[in-house]
Regions:
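Buried hydrophobic residues that stabilize the cores of well-folded domains
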Residues: 1-282
Length: 282
């Protein structure tokens, strides 16, 4: 079969190499269980090429290979170049990943390796990650160095993320901790934790930012400590309001204190922003 495509205002019939992705053909292979075991990229002349990042054009990889355990869980992923050798994937920072799963299929450990099968650090400095579960919900995420010792992520300043859930399995509290399990400020988010609340219909009504003592705190990059949301009878978001650490109405860094959502006959959402005085912002 052929594709018709336009290139520099000229129509062509046949395969073409996509300028944004760097390839013309993807070949995907499966094992006898229907599991994808490889994905390879080629140009219009069937030569192996690396797929490209659509934004900056950087080469990512020419082939991805997958391994599975006896239960069908993804046990390993390898990235390869046009010569068939393992290469560091630009976005992930490693050439190979190896996974472990529990009896329920939950991912419990992930280790990262370079093109020579040596352990390699991810951005943030960690070499491996472990996850712990309760009734299928991930309750802890831990980051380790090359010696499998807990370590502080250099990019976000925490070693452990602890998560709590309600009886319906909804997240109600996420907390960032050091290697001793004590709360610390995540330097990306600018807080030590997130608290979530829901109404009787399951709509998320509150997002609260917590400090290391568990108190409400203002995230400096946002200008508020608490988001309060209201919904209509169809579960559509109607109002979003911001509050400070003393639970007083406040505005974000752009002066917006409240957002009202309206819906037209087609159900398309429209937003209107207001300041603390109730004046609509343009």
């Amino acid at each position: 079969s052929y594709l018709y495509f336009l290139d520099n205002d000229v129509w062509y019939r046949g395969l073409m190499r996509r300028h944004d992705k760097g390839y013309a053909t993807i070949i995907i292979n499966f094992d006898s269980f229907g599991q994808c075991i490889s994905e390879s990229y080629f140009d219009a002349s069937d030569h192996a090429v690396c797929c490209l990042d659509e934004e900056d054009g950087a080469e990512l990889c020419a082939r991805i290979e997958y391994d599975y355990d006896e239960y069908g869980n993804t046990a390993g992923i390898r990235y390869k170049n046009v010569s068939g050798n393992m290469m560091i994937h630009r976005d992930w920072g490693y050439a190979q990943v190896r996974n472990e799963h529990d009896g329920q299929g939950n991912l419990t450990e992930q280790r990262h390796y370079d093109a020579n099968n040596e352990p390699i650090a991810r951005p943030g400095g960690f070499f491996s990650v472990s996850w712990f579960y309760d009734n299928g919900n991930c309750t802890e995420t831990r980051y380790y160095d090359a010696e499998k010792e807990l370590m502080m992520r250099s990019d976000e300043n925490y070693a452990i993320q602890k998560d709590q859930y309600d009886e319906y399995g909804r997240s109600i509290l996420s907390t960032y901790c050091n290697t001793e399990g004590e709360p610390v400020i995540n330097t990306v988010y600018g807080c030590a934790g997130f608290e979530y609340k829901y109404d009787q219909w399951g709509n998320e009504t509150d997002i609260i930012y917590r400090d290391t003592e568990g108190d409400m705190m203002v995230r400096e990059r946002l200008g508020f400590a608490w988001i309060k949301m209201e919904y209509d009878e169809w579960g559509r978001l109607e109002v979003k309001k911001y509050f400070d650490a003393e639970q007083n109405p406040t505005a974000d860094l752009k002066g917006c204190a409240e957002i009202r959502y309206e819906y037209d006959e087609q159900g398309i959402q429209h937003e209107r922003a207001f300041d603390l005085n109730g004046t609509e912002l343009q």
